[in-house]
Amino acid sequence: MKDLINLFDQLNWENADNYPEGTFKKTLRDEDGAKTILLKMPAGFRMELHSHITSEQNFVLKGAFTYQGFTYHEGSYQHFNAHEDHGPYYSKDGALVLVIWDPYKPDE
């Protein structure tokens, strides 16, 4: 069993590479091809159309963002399959999102 991590005391916010300037992350898990992060979107956040080689799940913890004309508020959930295009995203006031990428499976 892994040790419990106190996210706000033991993990620092880092610049989120490949995201717009001012976006930060806390990496909760990065093992065996799977990754989980807390993503802090700044006010005015915008990310264009993109895809990933693995599936992605998003759960809004705080704030909101807009995707394809629908606003995802606190408690909202999204799932995208591997190679599925998604975006653009926009957050007027910023958001805190739990993002989970599943392990890469070459046969997907």
Over which residues does each language-model region extend?
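Glycine- and acidic-residue-biased ligand/ion/polar-headgroup-sensing regions
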Residues: 53-67, 74
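Ligand-binding loop in jelly-roll beta-barrel domains
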Residues: 82-107
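Conserved short histidine dyad/triad with adjacent acidic residue
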Residues: 22, 29-51, 66, 81-85
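A short, N-terminal "cap"/entry segment at the start of jelly-roll beta-barrel domains
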Residues: 1-33
